[in-house]
Every structure is written in structure tokens, then in C-alpha cells.
Amino acid sequence: MAENKDMCVRCGEGVINIRVGAIITKDNHVLMVRNNRDNYFYSVGGRIQFGETAEQAVKREVREELGFEMEIDRLGFICEAYFYGTIGDKQERLIYEPAFYFYMIVPDDFELESKTFLEDGSPEYLEWVPFDTEKTVYPEFFKTELNNPSRETKYIVADERSVK
């Protein structure tokens, strides 16, 4: 049996989920992922595995999800998020998710083709989403921050604990 090395652990009644995201942009669009189960888009990326750095993890996730190697341009955002969701046992619980979002260098010969599936086997789809979309995207700060990229790393807190 394969060992699960994902840095996602139960903590009391909640979950700590440490992840990375790839910021892949082109012509005022960002490459996002969607699936048939959820009604929102999410960033290319996933959980850091134990023993990986965030940089190693984002490169691995890009390779797994896109079937393509990309180099990192820079760390764009560190985001601490608290939200309610389901992971693993499908029971809704509070999730604390520190995430590192990296701007990637998009090669000239990059072609869009999704290579991944969800844990339940359903496919994921890649789509270029306009920065100013009305669609629901996570992380939400992509809608405001990607229009005006900075060379500095930004720290963001997204706290949805009071939403429930």
C-alpha cells in the first residue's frame, strides 16, 4: 500500500492542510481547475508532501496536473485561510490552510491538457479564466491581486470562520 505523505492532518475537530498553488497567467487570464462536482474554480496545485519544500511541491503539482515542466518565477503570495469544508471523510469541518502561491514561467510551447482526477476518480478540467471573472474562484484574492502583480511577496489572510 502506498504511503500518504500529504501534509494534511487532523487537529482536534479541524484539519490542517498545507498546500501550494501555481499562478499561470496569459493575456489577463489565469489557468484554473474545475471539476463536475463543485461549482467553483481552484488554482493548479495541491498538498505539499512531507519532506518537500514548497518550491519542489509546486513543480511536482504542475507536472502532475499539466504533464509539463515549468520553472518558478517567484513566490507571489502566502495565504493563511480558515474555512469550512470537507477533506477525506467528507465530514464538514474547520480547515486551516497555509498556502504558498508561485508565479510560474510559461513556456512558449505550452499546450493546455489536464492530466488529473479527483480522489473519487472524476476528471478535473483546466480553463483560462479572466482576471475579472464573475465566476467563483479560489483563492478569491486572484480576482483582485492578479490584475496588478507585484514583484514583492504578499501576505494574505482569508478568514471565513464567521461565515458559517
Q: What do the PLM-derived regions correspond to, one by one?
A:
Residues 83-113:
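Active-site-adjacent beta-strand/loop module that shapes the phosphate/pyrophosphate-binding cleft
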